[in-house]
Amino acid sequence: MDKRTKIIATISDKRCEVEFIRSLYEAGMNAVRINTAHVTTRSAATIVENVRRVSEKIAIIIDTKGPEIRLTGMAAGFESGIPIEKGQLVRMKGTAEDRPSSDQTIYLNDPTIYDAVPTGSIILIDDGELELQVVDKADDELVCEVHNGGVIKPRKSVNIPGVPIDLPSVTDKDHEFINWAIDMDIDFIAHSFVRKKSDVLAVKKILKDRNSSIKIISKIENSEGVDNIDEILDETYGIMVARGDLGVEIPAERIPVTQRLLVKKCIESKKPVIIATQMLHTMIEHPRPTRAEISDVANAIYQRVDAVMLSGETANGLYPVEAVATMARVAREIENDEVNNGPNIDMNLVRINNEITAQLARSAVRASINLRVKAIVIDTLSGRT
């Protein structure tokens, strides 16, 4: 029995040999993701060429850097970072230039940060490793109290939960890679940090101007994107639930609830949905995943997601082929369970015109599973069947 759930594997330019890609494909990989934040167009082209040498059936997705807040580089003497301690006051300031940070002032790449962030806001650095709170605002700087100590390292990510940030949706680097993707006939663009439909429309305009049919997958990575999911779904081809940054923006215990909500919305809208981040994270360093990770993959498949994604597991992990094979085995097992024990599907999730049509659809799905048919062919005049 072949699996229906697709597996996306992130490939790095540091490890993209034809034989390596072939081994992932034979293990069950269906699509390759290229993270443009870590490659050049030249090195990305090598990945694409090698993927196509393996099989034209492998879809290719490029992941844009997107609009994100980051720290700047460090001044001389602070190249390895700036140590901070709990209770210490730190001054932070936005800049349009790449001004180096020091122990006097920490700079961020968003010049509007002073006006956008109110007193009392929490600032998270490096995916939440460091937490600060804004206690005062003075001289165009945010005065922040350190909640947990550590080292502020250069160019780390910055999240400010609950605070809408007005950054350009498409960066200069994104423009470069989107146009490159058009030239290379890439299949999908996964656009990062989508907050509202205008972010999707900005990418659509670039594609339309060049008469490109590349599909857009919107990455939901913040609470604003979750709040605006309905308008985003109106414009996007599909959704990626990117649980890494999302888990920093919202409380960890809300992640399963939010994932279920987003999957349900996608099914209702008949839009593909991908679950990403730390699905088999243990396999970056270990040959076997935890039981919790297996259950995470299984639950995503039970929720009827279209694809599950591997990031560091295949990009730089020690057991990339084993990770893909493990995910494929889980997918087959869950799908086989549905064949033997009945589909875990609620047809009411899908917007169907009336109850008669809904009952016919339910019966057709269950009959096809019980009889193990390969396809359902529908003859329709109205298009609503």
Regions found by a protein language model. Name each.
Residues 1-385:
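Non-catalytic helical/linker scaffolds that mediate oligomerization, partner binding
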